[in-house]
């Protein structure tokens, strides 16, 4: 009879642990549903998971994948996101096309943060090949933009960067791609840089994205002043686009 209180306490503790595990698994799957919607929501849900080691093997892989996703989206270091490697293999096994495809980007950036640049490019090239096979032009453009970024800032190979950005723009002509192409061309002293910078600003104005407009104008002005020694031209362009933005806003 004396063992009954002990057994009752043990049962209560088991229930508490089980409930906690169920709650944390629930948080994990809620976070998964926010992917490609709101990265801040994914992060807010993940930080509530206090004991990821208590998750099942499958759930731990998802937890690692989601953390890598958050770090990628927030441009944070991914040097500790080693779980992305087994997670990627798992999603290949599960035939989860969406996660598998995105995993190539996450793996590539993981290798980038570890300064394993050859592995970084190999991962992104594999991802581009899969995206092409799946006819996912948006994801393919994303990966090519990443690859071009590394050509600019890791290898300083501006010609390859320009070629890669051009392919990405042909797939998906977004403001950020034109802006990055303009930067690469400016660094390469290419006169066509102005066209791409101005086109990026035009697209940002059309979208009404004030933060991008300011960012692009500031960088364009710096490029004109320091790379092409044309500060007056940069000022004129800045004024024209700011007036266009004000007109659209009113």
Q: Over which residues does each language-model region extend?
A:
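Residue position in alpha-helical solenoids
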Residues: 45, 52, 90-93, 130-133, ...
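Conserved small/polar residues in nucleotide/adenosyl-binding loops
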Residues: 240-247
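Helix-turn-helix repeat elements of alpha-solenoid scaffolds
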Residues: 34-47, 74-86, 116-125, 155-164, ...
